[in-house]
């Protein structure tokens, strides 16, 4: 994964088209969602500080302040047990929520815009601009956004959902077994804050070791964490694998390369046939 640790976690669209959105069943029990939000407030740091040096060797300190916004289910518009000052309901604060989502999609554009423009029609199954599709996806009920701001500028964010997913359990290549999982959609760090381990800290320590392991205690048959990643994002894949993620049983598999004959000289060219994306998962028994 790149140093900004961006992750192309497009669940419904990357798995061929938008049909996967209906395939994924969100965990809609309000008490569990409340507890899940409280875990996010508890496990993600309220601020992240890092130091840099300028060309003269002088140290500067950046402090990123946390903001959490969630897209509620229809039956969880009011969640009394969650501190509204620390966790904002998108439906109750739509103006602010739209500002946050717009900043998030702009950061995604800087990192992955070219990929989305090339693959949008395949991913979303329509001809709309990829940003329009992405913003609609980003408003899916159940999504949680943990954002970090540097004086009003988005420095980093991650988004994820407590849901159910198939194709993760060993032997379930046909997507017949559904298990609770945290599905990671995005992890992005702005260029001004790269190189300080922020993305890894959010993914490994806050989400996996923090939120996911504690979710395991409250959710029967909880599997762990899953995500999707573009197949050509080798840096992202190396990081995920270093953290213990592996290609899920139901993930598209690498295809055998094809051999094409050149038009002149009778030569041959080996053409790789990787899928558009892979599904990675981290099991937490």
From Swiss-Prot:
Its EC number is 2.3.1.257. N-alpha-acetyltransferase that specifically mediates the acetylation of the N-terminal residues of histones H4 and H2A. It catalyses: N-terminal L-seryl-[histone H4] + acetyl-CoA = N-terminal N(alpha)-acetyl-L-seryl-[histone H4] + CoA + H(+); N-terminal L-seryl-[histone H2A] + acetyl-CoA = N-terminal N(alpha)-acetyl-L-seryl-[histone H2A] + CoA + H(+). Its main location: nucleus. The keyword Transferase applies. It is an enzyme of class 2 (transferase). This is N-alpha-acetyltransferase 40. Belongs to the acetyltransferase family. NAA40 subfamily. Keywords: Acyltransferase, Cytoplasm, Nucleus, Transferase. GO terms for cellular component: cytoplasm; nucleus. The keyword Cytoplasm applies. Acetyl-CoA binds at residues 187-189, 195-200, 233. The record marks 186 as: Essential for catalytic activity. Residues 88-274 form the N-acetyltransferase domain. One of its GO terms (molecular function) is protein N-terminal-serine acetyltransferase activity. GO terms for biological process: heterochromatin formation. It holds the Pfam family Acetyltransf_1. CDD domains: NAT_SF. It is found in: Nucleus; Cytoplasm. Substrate binds at residues 116, 163-165, 185, 228.
């Amino acid at each position: 994964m790149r140093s900004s640790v961006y992750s192309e976690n497009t669940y419904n669209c990357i798995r061929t088209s938008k049909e996967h959105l209906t395939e994924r069943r969100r965990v809609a029990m309000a008490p569990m969602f409340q507890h899940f939000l409280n875990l996010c407030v508890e496990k993600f740091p309220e601020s992240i500080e890092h130091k840099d040096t300028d060309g003269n060797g002088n140290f500067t300190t950046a402090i990123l302040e946390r903001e959490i916004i969630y897209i509620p289910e229809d039956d969880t518009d009011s969640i009394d047990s969650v501190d509204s000052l620390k966790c904002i309901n998108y439906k109750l604060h739509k103006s602010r929520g739209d500002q946050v989502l717009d900043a998030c999609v702009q950061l995604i554009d800087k990192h992955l815009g070219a990929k989305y423009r090339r693959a949008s029609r395949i991913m979303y199954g329509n001809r709309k601009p990829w940003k329009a599709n992405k913003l609609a996806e980003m408003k899916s009920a159940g999504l949680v956004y943990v954002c970090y701001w540097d004086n009003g500028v988005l420095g980093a964010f991650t988004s994820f959902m407590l849901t159910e997913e198939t194709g993760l359990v060993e032997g379930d290549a046909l997507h017949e077994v559904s298990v609770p999982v945290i599905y990671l959609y995005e992890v992005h760090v702005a260029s001004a804050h790269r190189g300080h381990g922020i993305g890894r800290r959010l993914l490994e320590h806050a989400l996996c070791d923090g939120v996911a392991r504690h979710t395991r205690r409250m959710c029967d048959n909880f599997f762990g964490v899953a995500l999707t990643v573009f197949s050509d994002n080798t840096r992202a894949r190396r990081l995920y694998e270093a953290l213990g993620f592996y290609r899920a049983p139901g993930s598209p598999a690498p295809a055998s390369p094809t051999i094409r004959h050149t038009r002149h000289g009778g030569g041959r060219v080996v053409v790789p046939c990787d899928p558009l994306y892979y599904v990675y998962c981290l099991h937490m028994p």
